[in-house]
Amino acid sequence: MARTKQTARKSTGGKAPRKQLATKAARKSTPSTCGVKPHRYRPGTVALREIRRYQKSTELLIRKLPFQRLVREIAQDFNTDLRFQSAAVGALQEASEAYLVGLLEDTNLCAIHAKRVTIMPKDIQLARRIRGERA
């Protein structure tokens, strides 16, 4: 009889069926205290969904008031009695978020170049160095 080559197949079934008697007896003797586990997505699924959602949207991602407080705190180092128009703070926030998004895109490319999917501080440093922002 000639030998035939075995090919790998995806399994369709799960575990083998258990005996019914043991499970029925166990169910009757102990009250069911544990509930059904809540549904959980696989790692990375929610992250990808968030990435797609934020790439579609155009709204600002940093909250306005915390950003405004940060701007005022930084400006106090230079001049104590500065006032800001709301449009000026809005323009600063737009520019800041655009800069951060671009930097994180370049950082992600640096991580991918290093055959990683996790960004690290050294990726940000490399991206800034290539851009010429930091020597």
Curated annotation (Swiss-Prot):
CDD domains: HFD_H3 (cd22911)
InterPro entries noted in UniProt: Histone-fold, Histone_H2A/H2B/H3, Histone_H3/CENP-A
One GO cellular component term noted in the UniProt record for this chain: euchromatin
Residue numbers of Asymmetric dimethylarginine PTMs: 3, 18
GO molecular function, one term: structural constituent of chromatin
Modified residues (N6-(beta-hydroxybutyryl)lysine): 5, 10, 15, 19, 24, 56
Modification sites for Symmetric dimethylarginine: 9
Residues found modified as N6,N6-dimethyllysine: 5, 10, 28
Sites bearing Phosphoserine, chain numbering: 11, 29, 32, 57, 86
Residue list for modification N6-glutaryllysine: 15, 19, 24, 28, 56, 115, 122
Modified residues (N6-butyryllysine): 19, 24
Modifications made to the protein after synthesis: Acetylation is generally linked to gene activation. Acetylation on Lys-10 (H3K9ac) impairs methylation at Arg-9 (H3R8me2s). Acetylation on Lys-19 (H3K18ac) and Lys-24 (H3K24ac) favors methylation at Arg-18 (H3R17me). Acetylation at Lys-122 (H3K122ac) by EP300/p300 plays a central role in chromatin structure: localizes at the surface of the histone octamer and stimulates transcription, possibly by promoting nucleosome instability.
Compartments, record wording: Nucleus; Chromosome
Function: Core component of nucleosome. Nucleosomes wrap and compact DNA into chromatin, limiting DNA accessibility to the cellular machineries which require DNA as a template. Histones thereby play a central role in transcription regulation, DNA repair, DNA replication and chromosomal stability. DNA accessibility is regulated via a complex set of post-translational modifications of histones, also called histone code, and nucleosome remodeling. Hominid-specific H3.5/H3F3C preferentially colocalizes with euchromatin, and it is associated with actively transcribed genes.
Similarity section: Belongs to the histone H3 family.
Record protein name field: Histone H3.3C
Native source organism of the sequence: Homo sapiens (Human)
